Amino acid sequence: MMRIAINGMGRIGRLLFRRLIDNKEIELVAVNDIMEGDNLAYLLKYDSIYGTFAGTLAHQPGAIEANGKVVKALQQPNPALLPWKDLQVDVVLECSGSFSSREAAEQHIKAGAKKVLLSTTGSADIPLLVYGFNQHALTKDETIISPGGCMTNCSTHILYILNAIGIKSVQCNILHSYTSRQELVDAPHKHFRRGRAAAEAIIPVEIDLQQSLERLLPVLKGKIASVSTRVPVANGAMADFTIQLEEDTTRQEINKLFATAAANEYKGIIEYTEDPLVSLDIKGNTHSCIIDGTLTSVVGNHVKLIAWFDNEYGFTTRMIDWLGKM
């Protein structure tokens, strides 16, 4: 049985805890975060998005007990000092966001873990592997991998499929729920807009999606522009693509392309729908992207494509998929 530890118990780390605690093929042996254990137990039990934990959960000295299983709870800020060797940890899920370079992530390896799976796009010297796209490129010798982020996992499949027709340019706006890297009330921030009240404003932010997509799809280098617009909701996202193709197409052709992909080689990764969804409807959806066929529009060779995704639940599903490959 694979032995797992989670470093960083923010939104992604806590959701992974909830989803892995009863996994029959994985043993969650430890979590690490600088927050106090009783506070961690509280946040694991009561979640403002996904509701109350379905089972028993309580804090013990140095541990969290969930559904009768005891998970060691550590508070070590230096990953090199974590007891991964003693705990025989196979894979560390690095969810803190603070150790995404190879040098930083290798601290977990030096501490005794066999492998590290980031929860974000890592530095350029870490393989960027998107599940459902290039997961077969993973080698047994690779100890640190990056699965991209939620936006990369949504966008990669869409652009790859459309590039079968031929893409001349892509403009992408990710309408995304606010995150912990924004302020709830106006406050100082090195990125001024992120310092504005997240629940009261529509806030454009810069993202590195373009760079990630160009790493994965080098044929599109210089053809992609992206931005994220943070909106006053706590969960969910909608990717808005404006794509110029090499040739004219139709709404029917584009929708058929994605409906076919969702039913076949991308089953479980892409979902296609013609239901009149809103962001609340995709909470808990496990797909990397949900193509909304009702919102597809085409003018000549210009395509407007809309895809929903649960930025937390969909992405943690892909991280769990990766554990099956490691």
What are these regions (language model features)?
Residues M2-G195, M319-D321:
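N-terminal Rossmann-like NAD(P) cofactor-binding subdomain of oxidoreductases
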Residues V71-A73, I224, L305:
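Generic structural signal for residues in well-ordered beta-strands
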Residues R3, N7, R11-R18, E27, ...:
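Active-site-lining helix/loop region of Rossmann-like oxidoreductase modules
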Residues G148-G149, I202-P204, D281, F309:
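Hydrophobic alpha-helical scaffolding
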Residues F99, A124, D208, T249, ...:
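Short alpha-helical
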Residues M2, S226, M238, T242-M326:
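C-terminal active-site/capping subdomain that shapes the small-molecule cofactor and substrate pocket
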Residues I64, L129, I144, V185, ...:
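Short clusters of hydrophobic/aromatic residues that line enzyme substrate/ligand-binding pockets
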